């Protein structure tokens, strides 16, 4: 069970920064 929680946490640690950077890039592209 602990390994599953750690895996889910690792996925969120990766997806959250990627999602934020992607959103910023989309806003910049739309701004131009």
Swiss-Prot record:
One Gene Ontology term from the biological process aspect of the record: photosynthesis
UniProt keyword Zinc, yes or no: no
GO MF terms held by the record: electron transfer activity
Segments passing through the bilayer: 5-25
Pfam families, per database record: PetM (PF08041)
Membrane topology: Single-pass membrane protein
Cellular component GO terms held in the UniProt record: cytochrome b6f complex; plasma membrane-derived thylakoid membrane
Location of the protein in the cell: Cellular thylakoid membrane
Function in brief: Component of the cytochrome b6-f complex, which mediates electron transfer between photosystem II (PSII) and photosystem I (PSI), cyclic electron flow around PSI, and state transitions.
Protein's recorded name: Cytochrome b6-f complex subunit 7
Keyword Membrane found: yes
InterPro entries assigned: PetM_cyt_b6/f_cplx_su7
Subunit annotation: The 4 large subunits of the cytochrome b6-f complex are cytochrome b6, subunit IV (17 kDa polypeptide, PetD), cytochrome f and the Rieske protein, while the 4 small subunits are PetG, PetL, PetM and PetN. The complex functions as a dimer.
UniProt keyword annotations, A-Z: Electron transport, Membrane, Photosynthesis, Thylakoid, Transmembrane, Transmembrane helix, Transport
Family the UniProt entry places it in: Belongs to the PetM family.
């Amino acid at each position: 069970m602990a390994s599953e929680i750690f895996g889910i946490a690792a996925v969120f640690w990766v997806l959250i920064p990627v999602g934020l950077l992607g959103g910023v890039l989309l806003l910049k592209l739309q701004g131009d």
